[in-house]
Design a protein with these regions (language model features):
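Secretory targeting signals
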Residues: 35-37, 58, 100-161
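Hydrophobic alpha-helical transmembrane segments of multi-pass membrane transport/permease proteins
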Residues: 19-38, 54-63, 170
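Short, hydrophobic transmembrane alpha-helix segments
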Residues: 37-47
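Hydrophobic alpha-helical membrane-insertion segments
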Residues: 164-170
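Aromatic- and glycine-rich beta-strand/loop motifs that create alpha-glucan
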Residues: 1-21
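Transmembrane helix boundary and interhelical loop/hinge segments in multi-pass membrane proteins
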Residues: 48, 66-84, 98
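Long, hydrophobic alpha-helical segments
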Residues: 53-73, 108
């Protein structure tokens, strides 16, 4: 399990040292804010239903783009062969990469927790619906990350892996 933990830390570190991470987080939070404001202003009720539904569709397109580099870049840079010849079990490599991507999804969703707070300040939202909505979004993220990792394992090109992942999820 320590090997999976090391891969998890490496993947997170690799993601957050690039400016792409912060652009990705910013775009996601802007989309979430737009969906939240449109959902509340159009329906006039204290509900996150529209935001969560639109975020799940947005994540369907964004998460394969996030996971497209996991295996494809490792193959292109030659580190995949190094990993396969090292005493690293395949399950540990997959688990580390999957948990790192899922941790990024959790970070994305933590950024949207401001919106239920706004609803609670101005209204009386149904917390059971909000919690199950977030749980459903987390489970959808888990499935989307799995599909993205699978598509990344099929090809050496990250862009092709991203396209395969999106098509697979559609």
């Amino acid at each position: 399990m320590t090997i999976a933990w090391a891969i998890f830390k490496k993947e997170l570190r690799t993601f957050f040292v690039s400016p792409l991470a912060y652009v990705f987080l910013g775009v996601f939070l802007l989309l979430a804010g737009f969906f939240f404001s449109m959902g509340v202003s159009l329906t006039g009720e204290a509900s996150l239903r529209i935001m969560l539904a639109n975020l799940s569709i947005s994540l369907l397109f964004l998460l394969p783009l996030l996971t497209m580099r996991h295996f494809a870049d490792e193959r292109r840079s030659g580190t995949f062969e190094l990993l396969m010849t090292a005493p690293v079990p395949l399950w540990a490599m997959l688990l580390g990469k999957w948990f790192a991507s899922l941790a990024l999804c959790v970070i994305l969703l933590l950024g949207t927790l401001l919106f239920p707070g706004i609803l609670a300040y101005y209204g009386d939202p149904d917390w059971g619906v909000i919690l199950t909505g977030y749980l459903g979004l987390l489970l959808a993220c888990s499935a989307f990350v799995s599909a993205g990792l699978f598509s990344s394992s099929l090809t050496d090109e990250p862009v092709a892996a991203g396209l395969i992942g999106v098509v697979l999820l559609l």
